[in-house]
Amino acid sequence: MGLQAGTRQLHGNLILLPVAVVMLLLCTSPVCATASVGLPADCSRLTSSSPSGVYVIQPAQSPPRVVWCDMDTEGKGWTVVQRNTYSTEITWKESWTTYKYGFGNVQGDHWLGTEYLHLLTQQGTYKVRFVVRDKANVTHYAEYDIFRVESESSGYPLRLGRLLSSGKDYLTSYYSSYGGIHDNMKFSTVDKDQDQHSGNCASSYGGWWYDRCQNVLLNGKKYILWPEICPRVTACRPSSWSNPPMCADCARGWGSATIPSRSPSLPSPITATHTVRNQLQ
């Protein structure tokens, strides 16, 4: 499969989703310094008894951010940075500035923001887990021991380390039959084309780290792409046989957390699934 097959269900309310789920989760290795008194630098700084839910974090050199912390996934303390489901109202074909600062709702579909991904991953060594659930309710994941997004001035390029899970590596290996490679590619949007393709991949598919378009695509409105699980655009197209619509092979995805433009007071945690944590805790 390209992703390692895992449990047939996710913790919390994810099990209620009868379609494919995609999630992008972050976890940090070294202990991160807390940017402000009382605010953790990421979800890994929460106590192990903390429930999954909405929290306010403050990475170094960043204003406070609202995120979804997953305290149920193995290891606990995962920071959810993207979520994309079958019923999303997000087009994912947003501008550079919109992607930079993030959009959506942390309790639903959202994008943390490329700038905040950069600030978050500058604090230490982070690992990442991409999670996909297929229509048979089987969960697959790909985990990398290093995840980093560089600065805006360099184009927010993606840096990935070694694949820790089993299966083919469609992010750091080059596949000429698909879209090339994703590792070390700059981020592209509809109004800022930084891919290696003759056209603008983002104008067709949404913001992502493209080479000659993609092997893997998690930021799409009508489909997700992951070879051997969601191998074709038409394979993951929503169909009319279910309400809400479900896709033929994979439906939609889950990822991380959304960030509001202003930092609210710390809300009470809301029970749910995916979070970020410090590996040394």
Swiss-Prot record:
Q: Where is the composition biased (Polar residues)?
A: 270-281
The protein here is known as Fibrinogen-like protein 1-like protein
Which cysteine-cysteine pairs are annotated as disulfide bonds in the entry?
Answer: C43-C69, C201-C213
GO MF: cytidine deaminase activity
Annotated SUPFAM superfamilies: Fibrinogen C-terminal domain-like (SSF56496)
Q: Respond yes or no to whether keyword Signal is given for this record.
A: yes
Indicate the segments forming the Fibrinogen C-terminal domain, all copies: 34-246
Its job: Shows a cytidine deaminase activity on 2'-deoxycytidine (in vitro), however shows no RNA editing activity (in vitro).
Record annotation: effect of changing E143Q? Abolishes cytidine deaminase activity
Which organism was this protein described from? Answer: Gallus gallus
Distribution of this protein across tissues and organs: Expressed in smal intestine, colon and lung.
Cellular component GO terms held in the UniProt record? collagen-containing extracellular matrix; extracellular space
Q: What is the taxonomic lineage of the source species?
A: Eukaryota, Metazoa, Chordata, Craniata, Vertebrata
Which N-terminal residues, if any, form the signal peptide?
1-33
User: Matching Pfam families, A to Z?
Assistant: Fibrinogen_C
| Source domain of life | Eukaryota
